[in-house]
Design a protein with these regions (language model features):
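Membrane-helix boundary connector in multi-pass membrane proteins
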Residues: 114-115, 120-137
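Alpha-helical structural signal
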Residues: 53-54, 105, 121
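Alpha-helical transmembrane segments and their membrane-interface boundaries
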Residues: 1-78, 82-86, 90-99, 129-175
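Membrane-helix interface "capping/anchor" motifs
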Residues: 63-72, 109-119
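Internal alpha-helical transmembrane segments of multi-pass membrane proteins
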Residues: 91-117
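Active-site beta-strand/loop microenvironment that shapes enzyme catalytic pockets
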Residues: 82-83, 111, 123-124
Length: 175
């Protein structure tokens, strides 16, 4: 294989955890998405959103990541939804609203330090679907809270994992 192409096919993810932990992560993802799906069926609201699958990968497969912390997940989705609603009012064209929305969501999440990459899909989702307004805000924020809740319970079960990450405490006891 040519040297220049080798970097594209080399795995850069560090080996971590046991097979049991990986199986628990997969089960957690299935339960998390299942809970959101059950909420959708029960409430007749479109809670089962594609970006939540990507959130589940982070929440259950990489819970130590800053991108998987509750403030990032819930805050990122909240900011993304508010930006999306504003952009859809200002730009009637779906592709323009999606493009401007994604750009603004990236910038605002970065500025606020609540980056959650799956939330970047919300402007595209809203620009290409019939989910709008209060329904969009409710299902996105409600679904993200549900996923974080399931992840919190999931990581409490053995083999346990500290989630959410705790802020380090300094020697004098101050955070």
């Amino acid at each position: 294989m040519p040297h220049r192409l080798r970097h594209f096919v080399t795995r850069h993810e560090v080996r971590s955890g046991s097979t049991l932990q990986h199986m628990k992560s997969g089960l957690g993802g299935a339960i998390g998405i299942g809970a959101v799906g059950a909420l959708a069926v029960t409430t007749h609201q479109p809670f089962l959103l594609a970006p939540f699958g990507a959130s589940a990968v982070l929440l259950f497969g990489h819970p130590a990541s800053p991108l998987a912390q509750p403030a990032n997940v819930i805050g990122g989705y909240f900011v993304a939804t508010l930006v999306t609603l504003l952009v859809l009012m200002l730009f009637p064209g779906a592709w323009v609203a999606a493009a401007v929305g994604v750009g603004l969501v990236i910038a605002l999440m970065s500025i606020l330090r609540i980056t959650h990459p799956p939330a970047g899909a919300i402007p595209i989702l809203a620009a290409t679907s019939t989910i709008q307004g209060g329904t969009l805000l409710g299902v996105v924020v409600g679904g993200s809270i549900g996923l974080v809740g399931v992840a919190s319970l999931h990581h409490w079960l053995p083999p346990r994992f500290e989630y959410p990450k705790r802020r380090p405490v300094k020697e004098n006891g101050a955070p």
